[in-house]
Amino acid sequence: MQQLANQLFQKTIRRWVPFWRDVSPQHDLLKKLSLDPNLNAADEKVLLTWMDACLKDNGGEVAARMRAAELGRRFLDLNDEGRVRFLTLMADNYAVDEVRLTQVIESWLAANSSERTHLEADLRSALEPPRMKLLTQFNELPQGIKFLVDMRAELLRLRKEHPKLAPLEADLKRLLSAWFDVGLLQMEEINWRSSAELLEKLIAYEAVHAIQSWNDLKNRLDSDRRCFAFFHPNMPEEPLIFVEVALVKGMAGNVQELLDEAAPLEDISLADTAIFYSISNAQKGLSGISFGNFLIKQVVKKLQQE
């Protein structure tokens, strides 16, 4: 199943590239960003210049989006070593400006109450690392939010071996926590008539009881079963978390009874119990951003209406 998940990730990457090429038309500056997959020392200097240009909005908002799109495309072209260097550059060079922050804090401490009101905005600005603006530019691009979710998944994987990346990961988590507020998510039922792409992802993302085959999946989506997932408006066909439910009369002795493909269908008109036998977080990059309890509450409400 891990191999299938990796294949889906690569398929997603191939979809991003044309999207991002569309917002990166031919431009003299864009032609200069050509990076070795390992991101060598010379490339690092070019990359820093490029990131600076993104942050300064040279040429206006459209040009900044074009640069951010090209930056994202080049990140996807890097190998593991190159991505570590890319992320380390962001972490090291675009953190909070400690000198400016110290100056603002000293001004705030020396100010009277009325002056502090005006300095609060300066303090908030000084606490915001420049890389937050760059991450936000990625989010504004087609498939950008999925790009950032997967970037955080990489940061979570890398931060133990590369502790310098921890602050960047924390910044990205803060952004994603706001963008994935439960009020923005949409609950949808998944059934056997859902798209093949979505069903394929259920197989890949199931984290509790592995789905062994398409027949196994079909059994879990039969008339006496329910499957619900949360989706983000900017990540269609990408479940964030999903729950599998069995509608039965009484209680099952064990989960194997629920997964038995040879078991007869339950008459749902007689069902008096909903067994939530599996809940899976589908996006590693959203780890620590909890909406499982809210999904369960929504599903319970939906089933009560049935």
Task: Annotate each PLM feature.
Residues 1-306:
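Extended, composition-driven regions rather than compact fold-specific motifs
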